[in-house]
Amino acid sequence: MATQQNKNRVYILLQYVLAALVLIAAVEYFKYKTRISYEWFHCTVQSEELFDHPEGSPLKLWAIGGPSCDKRGELKTIMKRITMDFDPNVEPVKFCIVEDTKVKSIHYPIEDGNKGDPGYISFVGYERDSDVVEQACASYAATVFNL
């Protein structure tokens, strides 16, 4: 009887392992299939150099994406990009974030080619570019933050 019970436990264990593997495979398959449409599911940061400076030039950042890229998603994506790309241990970082109040909190893309206006834009640069960042932020009357 003990061997029959052990066989049942092994069989149940194999079922759980197989179910876990199927779930992992389903998640990986979903990630593979949506890789092509990544920006539809996530916010993607777009950037533009403010001026032609050498290394570490100040940037204008904004985020675009699909239905999940509302103003909250845009703000999170921009802040993540600032903290990943600019290291305050190397040199102090200055940035500001400007909200476009004409854009609704939840705004969906108009069509594939046109994602609409961004809800937030940001100007960011290192301390050596502080004049450029402060000038860009002042044109929107935005507060400059320091990291």
Swiss-Prot record:
The chain crosses the membrane at residues 10-30. One of its GO terms (biological process) is lipid metabolic process. It is found in: Endoplasmic reticulum membrane. Residues 1-9 are cytoplasmic. Keywords: Endoplasmic reticulum, Lipid biosynthesis, Lipid metabolism, Membrane, Signal-anchor, Transmembrane, Transmembrane helix. GO terms for cellular component: endoplasmic reticulum membrane. Residues 31-147 are lumenal. It comes from the Eukaryota. It is a single-pass type II membrane protein. Component of the ceramide synthase complex. Belongs to the LIP1 family. Component of the ceramide synthase complex required for synthesis of ceramides. This is Ceramide synthase subunit LIP1. It comes from Kluyveromyces lactis (strain ATCC 8585 / CBS 2359 / DSM 70799 / NBRC 1267 / NRRL Y-1140 / WM37) (Yeast).
